[in-house]
Amino acid sequence: MTLAAQPHVLAVEVDIGTHETAKFLGLTWHWDTILTSVIAGVIVVGLGLYMRWTARSGVPSKMQLLFEMLVSWVNRQVEESMGLRVAPFVAPMAVTLFVYILLCNWIGVLPSGHPEHLPAPTADINLTLTLALVVIVPMHIVSLKRRGLGRYIRHYFEPYKIFFPINVVEELAKPITLALRLFGNIFSGAIMVSLLALMPPYVLWLPQWLWKLIDLGVGVIQAFIFALLTILYYAFATATGGHGASDEHADGGDSSSRQASPTPLPAGQVR
């Protein structure tokens, strides 16, 4: 048999992006992604119920205090840095998204074999795109209610009418960039884990654990970026105040002080 006729043998072979699938209702379901995302969701709901129970007891827990501190800090940072006052529901929603995405990212870091027993659900584009749509679609609905139809349509033509196609593309790109940014970073971590798993066992432990530490940090950063962009998108779409409100309050204060200032009396007269 000649060399050309010999079968091509790979030194290593890594399956990337494969999922455990099942057929149901004529659709293909990634049941591993569904399982891990449900696990993260159950943990988030459990934390919420626990904080609600401690709030009813009259003695707030450390977790509740931390959550309230995060919400207050987020609102304050957005208002002070950008002059935008976000709607009250935005910061709690962003913090909840942060915790959920963080748990989804960290599930893939849990010690396991190759392939992972519990792969990170955020390494599946279906979940990240769903999360992005969950953020963007309600944002447009809330923006339409806050601004009204006329003002909502008019903001696509700002600052000039020629910017209309650019503004439309920008809005269409928001869910895509949100989804791809999170997916790409977490998926690349899964690729690294798969490649490290091919190393000999006697040297695998060191790079594997070093990468898991890096992966933990990447999970935090990506969850934070997703939550931060959520806040910024809603801040611009549902802002109830900002510089305009501050100026209005300042003008109101000046006018009230002018009204309250006493009229000058003729010389020699006192009140």
From Swiss-Prot:
It is a multi-pass membrane protein. It is found in: Cell membrane. Residues 247-271 are annotated as: Disordered. SUPFAM superfamilies: F1F0 ATP synthase subunit A. GO terms for biological process: proton motive force-driven plasma membrane ATP synthesis. InterPro entries: ATP_syn_F0_a_bact/chloroplast, ATP_synth_F0_asu, ATP_synth_F0_asu_AS, F0_ATP_A_sf. It holds the Pfam family ATP-synt_A. The chain crosses the membrane at residues 31-51, 89-109, 124-144, 186-206, 216-236. Keywords: ATP synthesis, Cell membrane, CF(0), Hydrogen ion transport, Ion transport, Membrane, Transmembrane, Transmembrane helix, Transport. GO terms for cellular component: plasma membrane; proton-transporting ATP synthase complex. Disulfide bonds: none annotated. One of its GO terms (molecular function) is proton-transporting ATP synthase activity, rotational mechanism. PANTHER family: ATP SYNTHASE SUBUNIT A, CHLOROPLASTIC. NCBIfam families: ATP_synt_6_or_A. Key component of the proton channel; it plays a direct role in the translocation of protons across the membrane. F-type ATPases have 2 components, CF(1) - the catalytic core - and CF(0) - the membrane proton channel. CF(1) has five subunits: alpha(3), beta(3), gamma(1), delta(1), epsilon(1). CF(0) has three main subunits: a(1), b(2) and c(9-12). The alpha and beta chains form an alternating ring which encloses part of the gamma chain. CF(1) is attached to CF(0) by a central stalk formed by the gamma and epsilon chains, while a peripheral stalk is formed by the delta and b chains. Belongs to the ATPase A chain family. This is ATP synthase subunit a. The gene is atpB.
